[in-house]
Structures are given as structure tokens and as C-alpha cells.
Regions:
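Polybasic/polar functional segments that serve as interface/processing modules
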Residues: 1-110
Length: 110
């Protein structure tokens, strides 16, 4: 089913929300940088972070193809493993015939 996923407010430098247009499988150094960022968002949310995939930093829905979405989710899984965090819930929204956005709830005991 196609849903209307609204644009979001611009991403803030603080808080537990992180927007990602997409992530490509990348090297260890890049993973470590993203892991530090994820840990920061989790701490800002007292153990909980919300990642929105397919959303630019300005909050606009960018609509990514399904293979890019699954690659981004897999990158986030690997990053969460690095910091011993858990992806608790993944929601995938089809926003048109070929494009998607996703939300991921990530938690860690702090």
C-alpha cells in the first residue's frame, strides 16, 4: 500500500532523531564515525534513538529505491552492533510505485 509520508522538521544537532538519505556499505573508519553519531543520538534520547531513512537533513522526503533502503538498513544494523545497540523496530513505507522511506527504533542500555 502506498502511504503519504510527510516531510519532517529540519534535523537538529541535538535530540534523538537522525535523518539519513541513504548509507552505502562502507569501510571501518566510516562505520566508527557513524557509530559515534548513533551513540550520541541514543544518549540524547536516554537510551532510544529514532532513525528516519530516505529523509534529507532539511526534513524533506527523498524517496529511495528498495535496494538502497535495504542496504542502508543493513549498514545501520552493523553500526548498531559496533556499539552494542539493538534495532527494536523497523517500519518501511512505500511512498510511490518504486520509492520507500523507513523508520528504525534503536535502543541501548545506558
Amino acid at each position: 500500500m502506498i502511504v503519504k509520508f510527510p516531510n519532517q522538521p529540519p534535523e537538529l544537532d541535538y535530540g534523538n532523531r537522525e535523518y539519513k538519505r541513504l548509507l552505502k556499505l562502507c569501510n571501518r573508519k566510516s562505520f566508527e564515525s557513524k557509530a559515534t553519531q548513533m551513540l550520541y543520538r541514543i544518549y540524547e534520547g536516554n537510551g532510544h534513538a529514532l532513525y528516519l531513512v530516505g529523509i534529507d537533513a532539511n526534513g524533506r522526503v527523498t524517496r529511495i529505491k528498495y535496494p538502497e533502503l535495504t542496504e542502508t538498513i543493513e549498514c545501520l544494523r552493523e553500526i548498531s552492533r559496533i556499539i552494542d545497540a539493538t534495532i527494536k523496530k523497523i517500519n518501511i513505507y512505500r511512498v510511490d510505485d518504486t520509492s520507500y522511506v523507513s523508520t528504525l527504533r534503536i535502543t541501548k542500555e545506558i
